[in-house]
């Protein structure tokens, strides 16, 4: 079984994703990056692009992003759009 982390993707008034994920790929200012379980802690702005979530059950979901911010800490990631 793949290692997971808790991921929340939200925008004002709406949770788009809230659950266990294997990976999330996000568009950052310096290029696309992927967060996985036990990733180093950081905060970074996000740019226009697509977020791709690989859920613990193996499904993949995508979300269009105009801009936002991602925070990773203590095996949790929060993406605010």
PLM feature spans:
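Compact, glycine-rich, soluble single-domain proteins
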Residues: 2-81
């Amino acid at each position: 079984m793949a290692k997971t982390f808790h991921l929340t993707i939200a925008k004002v008034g709406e949770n788009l994703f809230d659950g266990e994920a294997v990976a999330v790929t996000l568009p950052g200012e310096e290029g696309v990056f992927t967060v996985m379980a036990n990733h180093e802690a950081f905060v970074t702005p996000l740019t226009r692009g697509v977020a791709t979530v690989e859920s613990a059950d193996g499904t993949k979901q995508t979300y269009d992003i105009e801009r936002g911010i991602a925070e990773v800490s203590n095996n949790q990631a929060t993406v605010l759009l």
